[in-house]
Amino acid sequence: MFNKHVKTFQYGNQTVTLETGEIARQAAAAVKVSMGDTVVLVAVTTNKEVKEGQDFFPLTVDYLERTYAAGKIPGGFFKREGKQSEKEILTSRLIDRPIRPLFPEGFYHDIQIVAMVVSVDPEIDSDIPAMLGASAALVLSGVPFAGPIGAARVGYVNGVYVLNPTKAELAKSQLDLVVAGTSKAVLMVESEAKILPEDVMLGAVVYGHDQMQVAINAINEFADEVNPELWDWKAPETNEELVAKVRGIAGETIKEAFKIRQKQARSAKLDEAWNAVKEALITEETDTLAANEIKGIFKHLEADVVRSQILDGQPRIDGRDTRTVRPLNIQTSVLPRTHGSALFTRGETQALAVATLGTSRDEQIIDALSGEYTDRFMLHYNFPPYSTGEVGRMGAPKRREIGHGRLAKRALLAVLPKPEDFSYTMRVVSEITESNGSSSMASVCGGCLSLLSAGVPLKAHVAGIAMGLILEGNKFAVLTDILGDEDHLGDMDFKVAGTTEGVTALQMDIKIQGITKEIMQIALAQAKEARLHILDQMKAAVAGPQELSAHAPRLFTMKINQDKIREVIGKGGETIRSITAETGTEINIAEDGTITIAATTQEAGDAAKKRIEQITAEVEVGKVYEGTVVKILDNNVGAIVSVMPGKDGLVHISQIAHERVRNVGDYLQVGQVVNVKALEVDDRGRVRLSIKALLDAPAREENAAE
């Protein structure tokens, strides 16, 4: 019934198994990948016909996590999985990025990849198995795909690279890097690091690429065994006559356009060139394929002009050489009521970054397959249509916005203060108000400045820069601080963020095969040069953390004995509610007895702290207290005196006065304030007090007989 094929190979410390032919047999190809107890099912479906009017490659990648994979039932009213989580979106992008450039130009058939996590080992992340499964399934589907690709996670523990580290190993690692590529070249890198030098980062990329060859070879052997039927697809031949026509109509106008330094004016000139081509060559009778071909030729002409100018040593689109960073303008504390803010402008790219401080109750609760955890630092990136001068729909953040926000967050994680040194929850929002290349790196710079503006004691300043590449044969040029057009028309998008000491985040997307270690080395060195230049200007604008905003909450931390937690909370929360209501504060108590008080003023925080200290204080034997009589005991036993909140003691009738007391009520009344001395605290915490001990003893009466 099943034509099942299985391939097993050793990958680092893990055994990987690829299976096909048993599940999802109606898909173009389906592969089940197992790594330890983590199992991912990847299915690829295709459309043999191109849709009418299709002028781009419609590749869709969806990575989905099922809660049953971890033995859980989803929360919420409907009890089923809903929209994709941030982890699912980021992993979908991780699969998409190295695969997309391996499809041939002019291939416009629908391809859908669905990677579904059906079992999860808490120690093994499902992203690497999902990437390997997508690679294998695409090869088995027979589509024109220049793969397979391999993927590897690289850690760095005690100066040694670790292949596919477990969750426990990652906790000790200075690096979390995912690299993907073919047998010949690296295509994608995504990483965060704890301020590592460039040579260590490059070494990790090379190490990961070397190690993934095992996976690539295994997928090739797997495909040879399955022997899939390949698509009979050929790239359309170049119509040289049509190319000449388009060049004749628009060639000179395109060259003139790329001499214009200002983006909007340049775009208008390019529109003029395209409109001339449309008028001359596209009519109502022109079919979609022909129109797409003309559009493709026009785009190629644009790329040829820009690329040839740069490789010939001519100035770039905006007049710069290959190493110059665009002019910078930095302003901090630009918004009066926010906790911290910065306006970071680099050329025609601008980010308004705003930092907000909160308490531990503001931490984001993340219900992941591996277990629930909280996140004290959030960075959200917004890219409104007006940032590029366009009209567009506003709505929920798109995958690109999620990805850019995550990259900026990873860049800043290494310099955040430890929770014990700075117990605030931090949120940064980066509003991209102008965009012409590298807005994610502007978010890194702006995010760092806004946190410093908010008074966050960062370990160091962090800046980011985007690098580009033009490669033709043996000639290449590495570009510093790329524009949007250079990103679209170039061969690489290489983003590096870090401090003066090293790299904190690295992201690389390569559109061609053939990027060498030498090119990556030059790009990293050039990026460091640019990063240090930006850092100098950032430090000149704000040298270190500023004073905490008057509008930010003040956090006061104190530690109490765990046995006292119940007393601070009170019966049904009565005590803690009264403290928060009376002082206007917010109080959070951890299981270990750490108390965090959030207050709008120093006075309110001090008042709440004093109340808690009074509740948790122990009565000291021999100490004098000012107390209040709260009860006169029956049978003339004595009185109960409250010496501090929640702490009462007994003044026995014999301890009220030196003379004989016949009636307690003759000496004490409820509500009366008296000074008492603590005589004893027994094993059960009961307190014995004395008023008499503080009174002068009466002089002895002389014998009357004398």
Curated annotation (Swiss-Prot):
Gene3D superfamilies per UniProt: GHMP Kinase, N-terminal domain (3.30.230.70), K Homology domain, type 1 (3.30.1370.10), Nucleic acid-binding proteins (2.40.50.140)
EC number: 2.7.7.8
Molecular function as annotated in GO: 3'-5'-RNA exonuclease activity; magnesium ion binding; polyribonucleotide nucleotidyltransferase activity; RNA binding
SUPFAM superfamilies: Eukaryotic type KH-domain (KH-domain type I), Nucleic acid-binding proteins, Ribonuclease PH domain 2-like, Ribosomal protein S5 domain 2-like
Cofactor requirements of the protein: Mg(2+)
Chain sites annotated for binding Mg(2+): D487, D493
Keyword Hydrolase applies: no
Function: Involved in mRNA degradation. Catalyzes the phosphorolysis of single-stranded polyribonucleotides processively in the 3'- to 5'-direction.
Protein name: Polyribonucleotide nucleotidyltransferase
Gene: pnp
